[in-house]
Amino acid sequence: VTKEDVKNAAEKYFLTNNTRVFVTGKGSEIIDALEGLEYNGKELTIRYFDKFGNETSKPNYSVSDDVSAESIVANYINSIGGRDRLEEVQSIEVTGNANLNMQGQSFVLEFYSLKNNQNQSLSTVTAGGMMVQKSVFNKYQGYNEVNGQRIPLTDSELESAIIDSALFSELNYDFSTIELVGRSVVNDEKVYEIKVTDSKTEYYSIESGLKIKEVETTEIEGNQIVVETTVNDYEEIDGVLIPSEINQVTPALPIPGGITIKFSKIKLDVKTSDSDFN
């Protein structure tokens, strides 16, 4: 087959009067660019379909004037216990596990996290009693440990660690730098999409007010790594709602659909000391 054969076939069968162009993607990001497109002076007709291929109406991503990023986060804070209750919490300890099946082998990953209100945090991942990964942040410095090798946090990682080590980082958001992107849909649930930083986006349920998803981008050795975390369920612990099951999609574990982590033990106000974060 030559180039001329392909060209001749295209000119014979690819006719503009019976051509359809299918565009898939995030509607809130592509609809504005598609509307108003013209061909030979005539505006193109746009039709919308849901994820099952059924024709539907044009999605509406607009947000009413009385809704802001600040009001959405304030509603979330109230939904999980209220500012006063959250500020009383001294520490959070969480233990969980995930069952994995990779290349025909089944094993269990165990997750542990300890944070306090002094900007100190510890998280570990173990498999079969062996430490797979460890992350520590102690107020102003920290490190990641992988396969026994300790790697100090970079300046950008320290900035993220300071935010992530907070028990409830939403209490300290600077709304002058946070953008309300609009409405969206996550797992068939209508949500508000908020851009917290250039590298972090959060999604809050319009119905319940709860945060149901985070998408965070980090750069490792020049590569952009995107981690998606979806909250499947919350559990009330001493008057505070804490995520009790999450699904995480990360390049570190290239598993279709990600991994589901169930937190079997969640404790508030456990005693901590500086030695816990060495």
Regions found by a protein language model. Give the residues of each.
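Extracytoplasmic
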Residues: 6, 14-19, 29, 89-91, ...
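Flexible, processing/modification-adjacent segments and terminal tails
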Residues: 65-67, 71, 78, 136-200, ...
